[in-house]
Amino acid sequence: MATEKVAIITAGGSGMGAESARRLSADGFKVAILSSSGKGEALAAELGGIGVTGTNQSNDDLKRLVDATMAKWGRIDALVNSAGHGPRAQIVEITDEQWHTGLDVYLMNVIRAVRLVTPIMQAQKSGTIINISTAWIFEPSAMFPTSAVFRAGLAAYTKIYADTYAAENIRMNNVLPGWIDSLPATEERRGSVPMGRYGTSAEIAATVSFLASEGAGYITGQNLKVDGGLMRGV
């Protein structure tokens, strides 16, 4: 009998996180969803999974989610780290408190969850971690200062983690969305994309699905742009 596959999705109540949960469920994963609203619990109920209302800025909330997942299914095959929105302001006007909030929202959200699932994946001798990041980490924009700064740090963290745990068959990769339809659309932004359109949350979820699959088993430590050609770096 095939082993059940289990995925945890944080910040999974709406947007790219929710769409990733739906796609992984369709792929056959049992899903456990954390969200700060009640939407994650409602979505989990719809998908036959577990929902916890809480925040990925809380070690206790994340532990409740992991413990509930292990109690129900006894394993965690995939962790998808999504995030909310951090502070935005002119670069020198961002306060210390706002920088610390950005750190919590965009980097510590991953680190906290990873600390909890890594021993479980080590015991299983397998696991994959997928972080939904941003296309602006290597070509930063003043529009998203705290996101760009801390998710650039996430890229470094991902490479170190991937190198550390590759031999134990644990992978970590980042998905780098550009302009996605979960954001308000403007003609200026649409016109900046070579493909001439916004991406969809479903396209991000499809990328997450691939990275969680056996077909991506030789991919780790990577930053995969899903941006319609927006970023110019090669």
Which residues make up each language-model segment?
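Active-site loop-to-helix junction immediately N-terminal to the catalytic Tyr of the SDR YXXXK motif
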Residues: 94, 140-148, 160, 189
